[in-house]
Amino acid sequence: LDDTKKDDKAYLPIEFKRSEAHKKSCNSIRVNSWKNECLYLDWNEETKNAKLKNIANSIISYGQNGPDIIALQEVENNNILNQLLDLLKPYGYIDSVLIEGKDYRGIDTALISKFKIVDSMLHYIKFSGEFEGKDTRPILDATLEVNGEKLKIYNVHFPSGFHDVSMRIDPLDVLSGLLKSHNYPTIALGDFNVNTKEDSKL
């Protein structure tokens, strides 16, 4: 399930983490918790299956058989998303979408739904000012068919609070433009990474 072209070296079985090259790469990570994951996390089949089961159990514990629509962030690929969908199919989930973005770590946004997903695309963020040319995760745009009507879903994963607040303003502007571009019922959700101090400013 590993994306070989992505920098996701934390999520590998421990036997792949014993080389000096791997250790050197991990030790260059400045955040200790991330460094420790990179060095010591044993991401094997058993660990992966337990994680999927825990996520599925959390989802179906909400209400009766889970929410109608699930927005996910930091999903590695369609392979793992489909495994989660398979666990959820007995509870009425029928469709999913993940479009591979350009994130170097290979983590993307995704949707799982009890309604048919009829269209989907990514909207990339263009930063302005001093952050022009920087990259971030795009907004996932999905169109669902609900009782014969279209419903638009925007799933976001904005830059973390580690970054300057202006790096969340540009994505919010893109989202605002998308909301104004049509008259369909819309839900915008996901990880906005806006803290309480920023909330009043944005």
State each model region's role:
Residues 53-61, 79-86, 110, 169-173, ...:
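Solvent-exposed, polar/charged alpha-helical surfaces in well-ordered, non-transmembrane soluble domains
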Residues 57, 68, 93, 98, ...:
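A broad "ordered helical/assembly scaffold" signature
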Residues 65-66, 106, 182:
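Short, well-ordered loop/turn elements at secondary-structure boundaries
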Residues 1-87, 98-101:
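N-terminal, active-site-proximal structural segment of metallo-dependent hydrolase catalytic domains
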Residues 36-40, 93, 156, 160:
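Generic alpha-helix detector with strongest preference for long hydrophobic helices that associate
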Residues 1-30, 114-202:
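Active-site regions of metal-assisted phosphoester/phosphodiester hydrolases
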Residues 69-71, 75-150:
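Structured beta-strand-rich core segments of catalytic domains in phosphoester-bond hydrolases
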